[in-house]
């Protein structure tokens, strides 16, 4: 069965997009048919896979099309599904137009379910669909959580790591109650970890204490190759497969696969 993982944290700068791109690339490297959907109007995930220009058909067009469920067939949306440098990885890009979608959806019928309609079609083709959610708790994020089977939460190893998590978990509970009863927590992922810093170790312990079993064993280190890769339009695994960042995301992908067995 297809898995739709929303990478979500309304707090910026926690490694959300880095995680979405590199987890998707890792699944693809493991020969899983994978799709990355960029739902962030900033379009950084698209850029991280080499798509710097706005595309003729992107996620904004697809969500508009999904106003009428009958429009959503694979043939109608395949133009938006683009190739990447990895055979098993495709992407649906985003751009600034997506920010307008928030206003367009306000008075729309079933406004939280647009992406879910699209997902019902895409799940028939892909084993893993990774969604890079917007860095805010808005209607676009509600669409993401309604369409997802699980949520992965990146948590930066810094002093205010758990700040804002209460709000995110409250939103997830509301979605579970009203829109998507099957939504699960895939796990919390510690990012930007530096074993030389006692603060990082302290925060990692605190996060594990607070979130216990939901925290992944894999931790993403602070790594220069992870920072450089997007400017080359590549995931870390293609930029430097031996880097600690690329290896950490591969471990994360394997952990998720093993958990599902």
What residue ranges belong to the model's regions?
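P-loop NTP-binding core
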Residues: 1-261
């Amino acid at each position: 069965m297809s898995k739709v993982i929303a990478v979500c944290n309304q707090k910026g700068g926690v490694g959300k997009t880095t995680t979405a791109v590199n987890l998707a690339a890792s699944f693809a490297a493991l020969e899983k048919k994978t799709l990355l959907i960029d739902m962030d109007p900033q379009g950084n995930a698209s850029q991280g896979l080499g798509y710097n220009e706005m595309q003729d058909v992107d996620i904004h067009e697809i969500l508009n099309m999904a106003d009428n469920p009958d429009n959503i067939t694979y043939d109608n949306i395949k133009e938006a599904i683009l190739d990447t440098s990895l055979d098993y990885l495709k992407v649906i890009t985003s751009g600034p137009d997506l920010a307008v979608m928030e206003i367009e959806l306000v008075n729309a019928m079933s406004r939280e379910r647009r992406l879910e309609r699209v997902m019902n079609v895409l799940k028939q083709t892909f084993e893993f669909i990774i969604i890079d959610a917007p860095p805010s708790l808005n209607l676009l994020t509600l669409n993401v959580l309604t369409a997802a089977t699980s949520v992965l939460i990146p948590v930066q190893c810094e002093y205010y790591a758990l700040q804002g998590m209460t709000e995110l978990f409250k939103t997830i509970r509301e979605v579970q109650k009203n829109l998507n009863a099957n939504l699960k927590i895939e796990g919390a992922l510690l990012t930007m970890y530096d074993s030389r810093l006692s603060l990082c170790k302290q925060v990692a312990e605190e996060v594990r204490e607070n979130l216990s079993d939901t925290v992944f064993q894999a931790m993403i280190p602070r790594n220069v190759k992870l920072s450089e890769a997007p400017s080359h339009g590549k995931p870390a695994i293609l930029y430097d497969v031996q880097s600690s960042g690329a290896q950490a995301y591969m471990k994360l992908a394997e952990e998720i696969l093993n958990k599902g067995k």
